[in-house]
Design a protein with these regions (language model features):
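Short, charged low-complexity intrinsically disordered segments located at boundaries
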Residues: 9-13, 31-33, 102-114
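Long, charge-rich low-complexity segments
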Residues: 113-127
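Acidic helix/loop microenvironments that form the catalytic cleft of cell-wall polysaccharide enzymes
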Residues: 3-7, 87-109
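Short, amphipathic alpha-helical segments
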Residues: 65-73, 89-93, 110
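Peptidoglycan-targeting cell-wall enzymes and recognition modules
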Residues: 4-83
Length: 127
């Protein structure tokens, strides 16, 4: 749901509003590393291990656009850094609250829920 709301599943991967599927701003990316991941070397090593070996050193923010595993890990770390518990995967309103808290403070819950209902909910329907 967050990827759908942030970038329409990739329609806006690299914009002024952030990089990748989760539209992570460069400053937030840097702050996450400096203020959260750096405090836990084991966790930082696991997340860093998801990034490209050489490309990360020359363009760490580009990794958010070209590496889905790394981008998803960073998005999850952004949520984890707020000490927020993940809700049930089929609870769009609870996910919307996380989205607004972590990714889009100005976002409207109903917009997230509408996006979730249009793009994620169909995946839960029986075939």
């Amino acid at each position: 749901g967050i990827a759908a709301s942030q970038s329409a599943f990739g329609a806006a991967l690299d914009s002024r509003r952030g990089h990748g599927l989760y539209r992570t701003p460069e400053l937030r990316h840097k702050q996450l590393w400096d203020n959260y991941l750096a405090l836990d070397p084991d966790l930082a090593s696991r997340v860093r291990g998801l990034a490209s070996q050489h490309a990360f050193l020359s363009g760490p923010h580009l990794e958010l656009t070209v590496n889905l595993r790394y981008s998803t890990a960073i998005a999850l770390m952004m949520i984890e850094a707020t000490n927020t518990l993940l809700p049930a995967e089929d609870d769009p309103l609870a996910m919307a609250r996380i989205w607004r808290t972590v990714f889009q403070p100005q976002g409207r819950l109903r917009d997230f829920v509408a996006c979730w209902n249009a793009s994620v909910a169909p995946l839960y329907l029986p075939a």
